[in-house]
């Protein structure tokens, strides 16, 4: 576990040893009890050749350490090293470039003075980096028996009505892809952002899953950090576990996200829309993202890499595809109701839209499909020709830009000769470009939890289809009532359509009488056998209700942009991409103005084999649609008070445990199935992926001599170990666009890469593809020069701004003020202070400006700041943009005669 790496003072006592020595010893037996492997331990003390058994037997290796004071020992199966004196795992590293001449005879370690090398960028751009033994991270399924019994069963203490947090943390902790990332790639939990939630979460996971774990821990640091950012969780009142999950995952994503730059050609046939204001019709309301599809900016502009092609017949005749689509469409009324019911989620959340980018494009063809891609704060609306659905093209728009407001390009004159040549003038946002760069962000959170939904609305008059892509992190499913179940179960008929606003039993408007009757009904239901009331609600029923098709007619007609009228329509919804871990939220709570209610209906859910094939889009590339349950969060009590617990399956021994704050108890599968589920975590199931991991694990024992060694991303290896579909090998997280290591990552390159033997690389590459192949690590000289230029630019811009602003503050009565958007200024400030690596785009004052009588004035209540004319000219000469928003203080004209009269009166008064 790389997360436990630290300096061990006993490393100096290790003798010289080779892999061949360890392999030979692994075929032997314990020198005391003659027990053979696996899991024998070899002493690493210099000139000591002792081999003993582990805790699964008599544990002679520990006895040997106590008697001889030989503290370091290596497991001959996993090649992990343990220090008895430090009671922790240690790592034996060596430097790059010092490989022996015979690649098949390599020392397992070359000890460094401080355990981990401190990086400085050398002048010859040769990267010296410790090499972590690959065996530390590719022991896929080999674990010691003592670890199987102990790890991951640590409770969490309640620190004041925090059972909601404890249950959520335990549920996440038992999601192997996320937990293994923090345990195996802990060095990547780096952030300069406060309150550094990822570091607190890393510390918590280390405590929960450490071999020497305590009975329970107190998650104080993590909780304090979340309360600092989100005031919803301050105080000691009971909160919602689902809200906490969303907040935590959003924070982790923000701190761990990495930007991926993509360059696209701008087809000249696509024209940018001038404004989005003209499109605020009823269809815009229809496409508002529901709470269940609360997208993060984690995978912004993912449409660039995700195909959602549909052939012409399927797209144009969507309404006729009844047999396969009758239960795979979502009710748009439920979308709006979702937002209303869960409005509380958005009130306490963070500013999640700072990475959102609005893009719009039009193809002026007769038959087009409107594609609307949702982000947190903006919608992506594109008209795509039916024949081009397989390759959607997106173009930046000037959303919200008033065409009457001018945005000036950078001034051509060199107003600031002192600026270095790195201050290249940027192009105006409105100027045409041949190529553009999309800002796309990814993190371990988006890799694991993000999926994509396709919503389609078809006009029944002109057959025009509007397609909406939404990125979801969880699915919020309604719990259907008895009448809704009957409709769902009878929907096999092609024309059977679930009415808008279904699941009325759960979400119909309630008054005080209905509220009282609901409680009476629940009491009666609890006293009468379930067979008396009808069929049991299953998770498949909830999914079918969520994806049910909806007929848009009457008061709920569809505003067709082609017909320019309200028309009858039909809406469908399917999943384009399933996430590796599917988070399902059952909507048990309904919040009204004066009171809240809870739906206590039992929902039956499978522990294994959840089949989501009926809800998958036809053209989806997803191959695995079967899920197994990992954990479930349960709520006991009413809407106003109650208690949260979690049932989790331990990934090491496949047993189920109940996590009730600091109490951890083993339970049966029937106990889990009878639970009142609130949030469920399902993981993709793939026997083929498990076989592939076992095959690669077996190859480690072959030890074929090779002349080349390959470097591979730790993050991708974590995917290979824990994902059902890891995807192509991606080494871009430690490489720049030039193929070298970025200078800023040189200091911790050992946390990013591992060295693979050639036979392992060949097998992985032939199976998954991707790359690029890397045999040599070096610091990129080009990036180093660019980084130095950027740093010099930051320093120069900051110094000039401070000087100009100081002069502006000393002015008594400036004649003019220039207003600047604080949103843009904050981005610029983050850049010059080194918090953001990329400079901001052109100055964008469109949100603070308004045009009246042909003059550009400041919008009332706008988020703006005031700077001097010199400061404006300085920033505008570098970044361009606009428009200019100028404030001129009113000038008071004083009558000279009145002034003389006042002076005369003052003189006479003094004389008296």
UniProtKB/Swiss-Prot annotation:
Bias type Basic residues, positions: 422-433
Keywords: Cytoplasm, Cytoskeleton, Endocytosis, Hydrolase, Metal-binding, Phosphoprotein, Protease, Repeat, Thiol protease, Ubl conjugation, Ubl conjugation pathway, Zinc, Zinc-finger
Domain note: The UBP-type zinc finger binds 3 zinc ions. However, it does not bind ubiquitin, probably because the conserved Arg in position 55 is replaced by a Glu residue.
Subcellular location: Cytoplasm, Perinuclear region; Cytoplasm, Cytoskeleton, Microtubule organizing center, Centrosome
Modified residues (Phosphoserine): 346, 408
Protein residues bound to Zn(2+) 3: 43, 48, 64, 70
Active site, UniProt feature: 163, 643
Xref: CDD domains: Peptidase_C19R (cd02674)
Role this protein plays: Deubiquitinating enzyme involved in various processes such as centrosome duplication, cellular migration and beta-2 adrenergic receptor/ADRB2 recycling. Involved in regulation of centrosome duplication by mediating deubiquitination of CCP110 in S and G2/M phase, leading to stabilize CCP110 during the period which centrioles duplicate and elongate. Involved in cell migration via its interaction with intracellular domain of ROBO1, leading to regulate the Slit signaling.
Record gene name: USP33
A single GO BP: protein deubiquitination
Protein name as catalogued: Ubiquitin carboxyl-terminal hydrolase 33
């Amino acid at each position: 576990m790389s997360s436990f790496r630290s300096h061990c003072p006993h490393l100096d006592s290790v003798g010289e040893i080779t892999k061949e020595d360890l392999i030979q010893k692994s075929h032997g037996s314990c020198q005391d009890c003659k027990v053979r492997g696996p899991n024998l331990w070899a002493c690493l003390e210099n000139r000591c050749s002792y081999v003993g058994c582990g805790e699964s037997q008599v544990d002679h290796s520990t006895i040997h350490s106590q008697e001889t004071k030989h503290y370091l020992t290596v497991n001959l199966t996993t090649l992990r090293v343990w220090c008895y004196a430090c009671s922790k795992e240690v790592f034996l590293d060596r430097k790059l470039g010092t490989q022996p001449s015979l690649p098949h005879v390599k020392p397992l370690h070359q000890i460094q003075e401080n355990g981990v090398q401190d990086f400085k960028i050398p002048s010859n751009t040769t990267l010296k980096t410790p090499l972590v033994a690959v065996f530390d991270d590719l022991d896929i399924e080999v674990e010691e028996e003592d670890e199987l019994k102990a790890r991951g069963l640590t409770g969490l203490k309640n620190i004041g009505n925090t059972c909601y947090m404890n249950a959520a943390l335990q549920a996440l902790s038992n999601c192997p892809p996320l937990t293994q990332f923090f345990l195996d790639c802990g060095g990547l939990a780096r952030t300069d952002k406060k309150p550094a939630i990822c570091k607190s979460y890393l510390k918590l996971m280390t405590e929960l899953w450490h071999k020497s774990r305590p009975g329970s821990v107190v998650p104080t640091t993590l909780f304090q950090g979340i309360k600092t950012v989100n005031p919803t969780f301050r105080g000691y009142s009971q909160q919602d576990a689902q809200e906490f999950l969303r907040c935590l995952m959003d924070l982790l994503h923000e701190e761990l996200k990495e930007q991926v730059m993509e360059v696209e050609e701008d087809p000249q046939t696509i024209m940018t829309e001038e404004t989005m204001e003209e499109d605020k019709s009823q269809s815009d309301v229809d496409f508002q993202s529901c709470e269940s599809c609360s997208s993060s900016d984690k995978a912004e502009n993912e449409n660039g890499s995700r195909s959602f092609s549909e052939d012409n017949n399927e797209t144009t005749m969507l309404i006729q595809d009844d047999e396969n689509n009758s239960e795979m469409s979502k009710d748009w009324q439920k979308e709006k109701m979702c937002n209303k019911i869960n409005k509380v989620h958005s009130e306490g959340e963070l500013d999640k839209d700072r990475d959102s980018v609005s893009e719009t494009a039009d193809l002026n063809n007769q038959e087009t499909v409107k594609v609307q891609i949702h982000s947190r704060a903006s919608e992506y609306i594109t008209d795509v020709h039916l024949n081009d659905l397989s390759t959607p093209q997106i173009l930046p728009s000037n959303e919200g830009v008033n065409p009457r407001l001018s945005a000036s390009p950078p001034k051509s004159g060199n107003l600031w000769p002192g600026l270095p040549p790195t201050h290249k003038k940027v192009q105006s946002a409105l100027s045409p470009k041949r190529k553009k760069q999309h800002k796309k962000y990814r993190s371990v959170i988006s890799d694991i939890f993000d999926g994509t939904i396709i919503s389609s609305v078809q006009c029944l008059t002109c057959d025009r289809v509007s397609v909406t892509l939404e990125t979801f992190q969880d699915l919020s499913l309604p719990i259907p009532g008895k009448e809704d179940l009957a409709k769902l179960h009878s929907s096999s008929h092609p024309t059977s359509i679930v009415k808008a606003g279904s699941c009325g039993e759960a979400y119909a408007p309630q008054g005080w009488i209905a509220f009282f009757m609901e409680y009476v009904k629940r009491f009666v239901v609890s006293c009468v056998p379930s067979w008396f009331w009808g069929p049991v609600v299953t998770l498949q029923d909830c999914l079918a209700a969520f994806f049910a098709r909806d007929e848009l007619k009457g008061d709920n007609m569809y505003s067709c942009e082609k017909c320019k009228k309200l028309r009858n329509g039909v809406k469908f919804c399917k999943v384009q991409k399933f996430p590796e871990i599917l988070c399902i939220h059952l909507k048990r709570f309904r919040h009204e103005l004066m009171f809240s209610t809870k739906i206590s209906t039992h929902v039956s859910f499978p522990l294994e084999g959840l089949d989501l094939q009926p809800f998958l889009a036809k053209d989806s590339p997803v191959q695995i649609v079967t899920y197994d349950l990992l954990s479930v969060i349960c709520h006991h009590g009413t809407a106003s008070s109650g208690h949260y617990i979690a049932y989790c399956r331990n990934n090491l021994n496949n047993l189920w445990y109940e996590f009730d704050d600091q109490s951890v108890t083993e339970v049966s599968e029937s106990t889990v199935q009878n639970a009142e589920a609130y949030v469920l975590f399902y993981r993709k199931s793939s026997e083929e992926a498990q076989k592939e991991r076992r095959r690669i694990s077996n190859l480690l024992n072959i030890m074929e001599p090779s002349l080349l060694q390959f470097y591979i991303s730790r993050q991708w290896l974590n995917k290979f170990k824990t994902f059902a579909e890891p995807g192509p090998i991606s080494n871009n997280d430690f490489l720049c666009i030039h193929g070298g290591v970025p200078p800023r990552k040189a200091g911790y390159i050992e946390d990013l890469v591992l060295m693979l033997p050639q036979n392992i690389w060949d097998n992985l590459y032939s199976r998954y593809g991707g790359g690029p192949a890397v045999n040599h690590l070096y610091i990129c000289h080009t990036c180093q020069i660019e980084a130095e230029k950027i740093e010099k630019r930051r320093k120069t811009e900051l110094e000039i701004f401070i000087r100009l602003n100081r002069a502006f503050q000393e002015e008594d009565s400036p004649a003019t003020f220039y207003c600047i958007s604080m949103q843009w200024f904050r981005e610029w400030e983050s850049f010059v202070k080194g918090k953001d690596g990329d400079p901001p785009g052109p100055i964008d004052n469109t949100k603070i400006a308004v045009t009246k009588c042909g003059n550009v004035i400041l919008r009332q209540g706008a988020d703006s700041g005031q700077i001097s004319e010199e400061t404006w000219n300085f920033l505008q000469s570098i970044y361009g943009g606009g428009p200019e928003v100028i404030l001129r203080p009113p000038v008071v004209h004083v009558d000279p005669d009145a002034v003389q009269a006042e002076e005369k009166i003052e003189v006479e008064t003094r004389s008296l």
